[in-house]
From Swiss-Prot:
Belongs to the herpesviridae small capsomere-interacting protein family. It comes from Equine herpesvirus 2 (strain 86/87) (EHV-2). This is Small capsomere-interacting protein. It comes from the Viruses. The gene is SCP. Participates in the assembly of the infectious particles by decorating the outer surface of the capsid shell and thus forming a layer between the capsid and the tegument. Complexes composed of the major capsid protein and small capsomere-interacting protein/SCP assemble together in the host cytoplasm and are translocated to the nucleus, where they accumulate and participate in capsid assembly. Interacts with the major capsid protein/MCP. Pfam families: Herpes_capsid. Residues 118-171 have a biased composition (Low complexity). Residues 107-179 are annotated as: Disordered. GO terms for cellular component: host cell nucleus; viral capsid. It is found in: Virion; Host nucleus. GO terms for biological process: viral process.
Length: 179
């Protein structure tokens, strides 16, 4: 709208530009949460007048409450993703091997290529598997020879059994590398 047309408009009471109003607060927000009350009490007065200090104090309380409500909603909707919480989790679990094992067990690994993977079953795999064809096919498709041999003695082993055995035989930090 051009400026000339704006000046020609007549505005009634309560219309047009109005200064920003402070929010109306019913009751004392700092009484809801003692942590908020402690943080507001620690607010520095500096060189503010009484009216300015009360205004800043009220806005700080509102900010703290909104931040608290946002954190609650984020935990409910998004799950806990804050850095502080994740740091506390790793500190309580302990860093190192235990957390590595927990993380690596959750990530599915691709089938490992064994020493005997030549496109078909080799004679050493056939001799180790004996009459059990299930263990030989498992070893040829990515399992290890020791897993195939153990599968021959105890019946046929499934693919998940073989891959979990071969993972447990590897040292931590050598995921997918041949030893």
């Amino acid at each position: 709208m051009p400026r000339d047309e704006m000046e020609a408009c007549e505005l009634g009471d309560g219309e047009g530009y109005q200064p920003l109003r402070l929010p109306r607060v019913q009751g004392k927000l700092e009484e809801i949460n003692p942590i908020v009350a402690a943080e507001v009490a620690a607010l520095e007065r500096r060189d503010r007048s009484d009216a300015d200090y009360e205004k800043v104090k009220m806005l700080y309380v509102i900010y703290l409450r909104v931040h608290e409500i946002y954190d609650d909603q984020a935990r409910i909707r998004l799950g806990v993703r804050r850095k502080k919480h994740l740091g506390d989790l790793t500190a309580s679990r302990g860093a190192g091997l235990r957390s590595f094992e927990a993380l690596s067990s959750m990530i599915p690994l691709p089938p490992e290529t064994g020493e005997f993977d030549t496109g078909g079953t080799s004679s050493s795999v056939r001799s180790a598997s004996g009459a059990s064809g299930g263990a030989a096919s498992t070893a040829a498709s990515g399992g290890s020879a020791s897993a195939a041999a153990s599968g021959a003695s105890g019946g046929s082993a499934s693919q998940s059994d073989v891959s979990s055995r071969s993972r447990s035989q590897q040292a931590p930090g050598t995921k997918g590398k041949k030893q």
